[in-house]
Amino acid sequence: MIKTIQKELEGLDIRFDEPLKKYTYTKVGGPADYLAFPRNRLELSRIVKFANSQNIPWMVLGNASNIIVRDGGIRGFVIMFDKLSTVTVNGYVIEAEAGANLIETTRIARYHSLTGFEFACGIPGSVGGAVFMNAGAYGGEIAHILLSAQVLTPQGELKTIEARNMQFGYRHSVIQESGDIVISAKFALKPGDHLMITQEMDRLTYLRELKQPLEYPSCGSVFKRPPGHFAGQLISEAHLKGQRIGGVEVSQKHAGFMVNIAEGSAQDYENLIEHVINTVESTSGVHLEPEVRIIGESLL
């Protein structure tokens, strides 16, 4: 199959049996059979249509910030959008390709004195992943500012989804069920005062640095906020701060995070997540639901 791929997708950036831990925020993850970096939408469409024609599974990994890739890796094509990252500003509308860094996109908004994106100034990951998850923080979320998203269907066709049809909810969008892949997104912002925007972004950045364990690899916030509770508080009350399995630990700085402190594995993450869920449920009666996505094959 490698020779067929090299022939049919000649000139494209495709890497074979590539370890994904080189690209994930957690620094864990086994190999992808075929890791592709399309430079434009035409290349992306070629990859998807080729994979479909050969019955090869494919998926988009995004910036891999809120994902745990299992140690056995991922079969088929894994597509990363690092090279699809253009951001343009037209009046009060920002259009960003899916691979654009979300934090950098908020800085572009600030440069143009556009307000509405400040909440995301510390959220790691890509624009595509943010739309997929309806990313949010400090009272704001993508649903509040999205105009529309251009997506690639599982059949390799392009279409546009208006914000009103995204079925946004807490860390949810319709894309999670449809199988569509975000290619780009348009955001409607408002004119604002550059100094006030800067001060708000500085304030939120300070809070993030104060509360979150940014010094270690992690997948960000591990659990969704349970109704009427805070996941981190429940985990702390269960005396799980500092709990460690293998090389992965419940952060002592913020119990809602798990950090890779000693070359941990994806299995360490999974085991610790399961332990935290079970312990919190037994101590508080609250069942925690993971916010992080766990994908790929286990080595076990």
Curated annotation (Swiss-Prot):
Q: Say yes or no: keyword Signal present.
A: no
Pfam family, any one: MurB_C
Give the active-site positions: 171, 221, 291
Name of the protein: UDP-N-acetylenolpyruvoylglucosamine reductase
What subcellular locations does the record give?
Cytoplasm
Residues annotated as domain FAD-binding PCMH-type: 27-192
Recorded GO CC terms:
cytosol
